[in-house]
Amino acid sequence: MTYSTSSTVRLIAGRLALDFVNTANWSDDGTVIDEKLSNRADLQIWMEALSLTEASQCATIEDLLALRAMLRSAFLGDGRSLNISLFDYVSPPKSQLTSIDLTVSHLPLDNLIVISAISILSDPREYQRLKKCPGHNCGWLFIDETKNARRKWCIMETCGNRSKAARNYAKKTRQQRR
């Protein structure tokens, strides 16, 4: 279900790049199961939820989805394989360097996302606390900012409760078979 067809924008990661990767639900093998960004309208809804309406939308949806897949691979990798092509997103051609605009919100959306990703991947404290939700067909990413680093679920109310309900159901089923 896409954002433009009434799916709620959930921002659980606290980092732009992670919330961008979380615009899809993922299978364990990395296949997109539930796509939230199918068109420009979906992208606009997501950007509004993040208050990024000033960011320019230069990239196509296809390019953004390719970037999302690349970022997810980088986040789930060993952390040492920071793909140099990420830097291509934030290095404009010299012909575009005619004036300097220091207003971050006016940068292209893909640049903002990549800057956020580089920040996570280059900070060992952030990267070490990066987790993937184990919920069935979820695969969302988040930084575990709890004091004891024991956060397990993207959102306890959804994935955590589903897991608990499945365990309870299995337990009751086993008891009934006895």
Predicted regions mapped to residue ranges:
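Short helix-coil boundary/hinge micro-motifs
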Residues: 1-132, 139-140
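BZIP DNA-binding basic region
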Residues: 113, 125-169, 173-178
